[in-house]
């Protein structure tokens, strides 16, 4: 087992594709990505470093049944964390959003995931500058940085590889 676990929630498959790209770039440092609806808390907790991906749905929701998805996802998983401690875990988020279609809650689905994990003691890393995006509001901002890597596969797909490479270099410097 590698030291880095990659987990994702998805509705359209775009987040899964990014998770696979991350795995390809990390190679043996990370295990193959797993959809969060296909894992257990024990499997999740087995990794000291977690890279977690989520899209933003509707008005800023995480994927899951309450957001209209056909299967469980992040919404249900974080509800099941209950009193689990993530102390000693290092976590970085990557989020997908559509800044033109949803400018009022761009990548806001990252916020509930960030809050749930940090409240349970996780060391959150991998924030990302908000420069180069055009949106009105996002709850995923802390100052002028997002709580994780932000990718817009709808409008800026041509920037994904460069953003991903830069973010992963920062992650590797922090955890290796």
UniProtKB/Swiss-Prot annotation:
Signal peptide: none
GO molecular function: electron transfer activity; FMN binding
Flavodoxin-like domain mapped to chain residues: 4-172
Keyword Transport: yes
Cofactor(s) listed in the protein's UniProt record: FMN
GO term, biological process aspect, one: nitrogen fixation
UniProt KW keywords: Electron transport, Flavoprotein, FMN, Nitrogen fixation, Transport
Superkingdom of the source species: Bacteria
Family annotation (Pfam families): Flavodoxin_1
Protein family membership: Belongs to the flavodoxin family.
Biological role stated in the UniProt entry: Low-potential electron donor to a number of redox enzymes. NifF is the electron donor to nitrogenase.
Protein name: Flavodoxin
Natural source organism: Klebsiella pneumoniae
